[in-house]
Each structure stands twice: as structure tokens, then as C-alpha cells.
Amino acid sequence: MALVVQKYGGSSLESAERIRNVAERIVATKKAGNDVVVVCSAMGDTTDELLDLAAAVNPVPPAREMDMLLTAGERISNALVAMAIESLGAEAQSFTGSQAGVLTTERHGNARIVDVTPGRVREALDEGKICIVAGFQGVNKETRDVTTLGRGGSDTTAVALAAALGADVCEIYSDVDGVYTADPRIVPNAQKLERLSFEEMLELAAVGSKILVLRSVEYARAFNVPMRVRSSYSNDPGTLIAGSMEDIPMEEAVLTGVATDKSEAKVTVLGIPDKPGEAAKVFRALADAEINIDMVLQNVSSVEDGTTDITFTCPRSDGPRAMELLKKMQQQGDWTNVLYDDQVGKVSLVGAGMKSHPGVTAEFMEALRDVNVNVELISTSEIRISVLIREDDLDKSAKALHEKFQLGGDEEATVYAGTGR
């Protein structure tokens, strides 16, 4: 008997009809001889609606109370899924994140999982019940306050539970039936991938693929939890994410796909003294403010005045905070000016095959040249090339790269209604 953890996204649970459909799939998995644990996201746009409601009563709501509010969304879908399963004649028991033993750090709004002690879930499984766990939430061990895990936290909840329970697989259900060589909404002939290594999926998640959140893939890799991305609208087996890139024979390594990201902003700090410790001053201030940095470029030092410029990208949502912080430091005479640009985007090519295919970077740049796209920043890893370009050029760049590296197929991809969550 296998233990299967299934996670259902908000689009899969947005109505009573879809909840009943999900319940039928869950019960079928149980009847096939499996133990089943289900992690639920909030229904449809519930989380966004709760955020709007909070803003209407308090423009700056307390973080603790915001977590108390937002976790209600998952508890609602949790209970409804359990009810639907019971209506089909199977036994189900729902749990909040706290009841399921999801222990987190104290940071409200973006807590990290530190441990999972799913004793009550294990007991219910032993009694033959289907266990339904509210995603996106946990509890701080010291304060006992409810916490939330940030956007995409239900994916992380599912993988963490799968690891703690020793599950055979963690299935992530949404409105897409797998991981594609590109977003089918941008590149119609994108092809579904049957299998990816953890490293390839980590790179795709890090550079903009919305199918899985980065933290969930990091967790799966750390605890070697196989993941399968599937659609709740079909019976297609989807994409399996498992194993290491090192296990892929060199001759079989391929270029995996193209991803785009519209969530970053570019910041340039001008006139920084070109001497030891000055760049560290910039990035220490940003780190202390918990602002993540992605791409970085430092210009050649100016001979005339001994200064340099540093350009970096950060989440667009953190851009105003970064600018406020750096402008304050500018007033202290640390540098001459700070520039901000939020009309940028990142396009990336990922694949284990880069290690064995000379000339990938040249072909990448030629593809962008052919569609008249200018590159502003470049970042690479062993299996990834990313460039920063104008946001308006993202779609045509993705299409050009996808065609250049022959990643497409003869048929158009099937796109179900929804957003990929």
C-alpha cells in the first residue's frame, strides 16, 4: 500500500462542483489501495478577497491578526472537501496546520517550517481515514501563534508532510497538467515534459516558472520526496520531478525549457567609492531589511574619481523599500544617486544539456538579436542562462528562444482555464 500526498490549488477548489470533482478523485485514489493525505489551498480568489477586506478596515493591519484572518480560507476549503468525501461514503478527517503538527518560525506572513510532527495525522491514517490538512499555515512552537507560509505555502506544506510521513509521492494538482518547455499561454506549441531532475525544477522555479514554488522544490530535494505535477481536470500522469541531474546520462541531457519573470525591478547605485567594503555596505543594508537580491553587475571603476556603479535586481514588491533605504544612505554621502526601473523582465533558458552543448550562450544571444531585443544584465549557472530585458520584450523573447533551441512540437498544448495554481 502506497502513501500518496495530494495538494489541490485554489482553482481546483473554487466552486462546490469542483470540490465534488476533487473529492471523487481523492476517493478513487483511496479505493486503488492507497493511504491518502490531502492538502488544500483556499477556494479560488479567497485569499485575495480576505486581503482586500483587511485593507478596507485597516490599511496597515497587524501581522499576527492578518495571519489569523488568512488561515480561515484554507480551513473553509478543508472542511468542505472532507464533507464532500464523506458524502461519497469514505471516512475523512480535517486538520488545521497546527493540528497536523506543522511547526514554524515566528515570522508572520512568511514563516518557515522548522519541523513537522504529524502524530494525529498518522493515527487517522492508521484508522483508515483520508486526512485533509489545511495548507499555507502552521504554528510557532514557542508562542503558539498561528503563522502563514507566504504565497505558494500550500505546496510547501504538502511536501513537508510527505517527507515527515515517508510518502511515496507528493502530487501537486492545479489547472495545468504538467511542466512545459514554456508557458503554453505564451508559446502555444510548448511541450509537456515527462520528467525533470530536482536541479532543473529548482532553476525553473527560481527564474519565474509559476508551476511550483521554489521552497517546495528545495524541500523535496532535501528530503528526496518525488513530486508529480498534475491537472485536476484530466487523468494525465503529468510531470515527475525526482532524482539528481547527475543521474542523467550525458548523451541524454537536454535543454529543458524557457521561463519568464515579470516580478523583478532593477536598481542602480551610482558613484560608489571603488574600495573594499563599499559594495558590502549596500548588500548588508538590503539583507538586514530582508530584501532578496537576484542578478548583480558592477561596472569598471572610473579612473577620474575612483568610483563605480552597482546594478542589481530585487523583487518588484520590495523595490520601494529598497529605494527608500538606499536614498537615506545616499544622503549620508555614501554614493551620488540611486536609479529605479520596474519596466524590466527576465527570460531564462534551463537544462542539464548546457554542460555538454558548446555554443548555447552564443545561440541564446543570437536568438534575442534576431528579434531586436537588448540585453541589460546576464546571470548564469551550470544549467541556466538568464538575462534582464525590457518587460515588453518578454513574450517575443520566449518565443524566439523556444524556436531557436527547437523545444516545441507539432501540436498546440492543452491549456485549461485558470492561472496555473
UniProtKB/Swiss-Prot annotation:
Catalytic activity: L-aspartate + ATP = 4-phospho-L-aspartate + ADP
Function: Catalyzes the phosphorylation of the beta-carboxyl group of aspartic acid with ATP to yield 4-phospho-L-aspartate, which is involved in the branched biosynthetic pathway leading to the biosynthesis of amino acids lysine, threonine, isoleucine and methionine.
Stated name of the protein: Aspartokinase
Pathway entry: Amino-acid biosynthesis; L-lysine biosynthesis via DAP pathway; (S)-tetrahydrodipicolinate from L-aspartate: step 1/4; Amino-acid biosynthesis; L-methionine biosynthesis via de novo pathway; L-homoserine from L-aspartate: step 1/3; Amino-acid biosynthesis; L-threonine biosynthesis; L-threonine from L-aspartate: step 1/5
Binding site for substrate: 25-30, 45-49, 74, 125-126, 151-154, 274-279, 292-294, 298, 360-361, 374-375, 381-382
PANTHER family (UniProt xref): ASPARTATE KINASE, ASPARTOKINASE
Name of the coding gene: lysC
SUPFAM superfamilies in the record: ACT-like, Carbamate kinase-like
Residues annotated as domain ACT: 267-343, 349-421
GO MF annotation: an example: ATP binding
Top-rank lineage group of the source organism: Bacteria
The keyword Signal belongs to this UniProt entry's keyword annotation: no
Family from the record: Belongs to the aspartokinase family.
Quaternary structure and partners: Tetramer consisting of 2 isoforms Alpha (catalytic and regulation) and of a homodimer of 2 isoforms Beta (regulation).
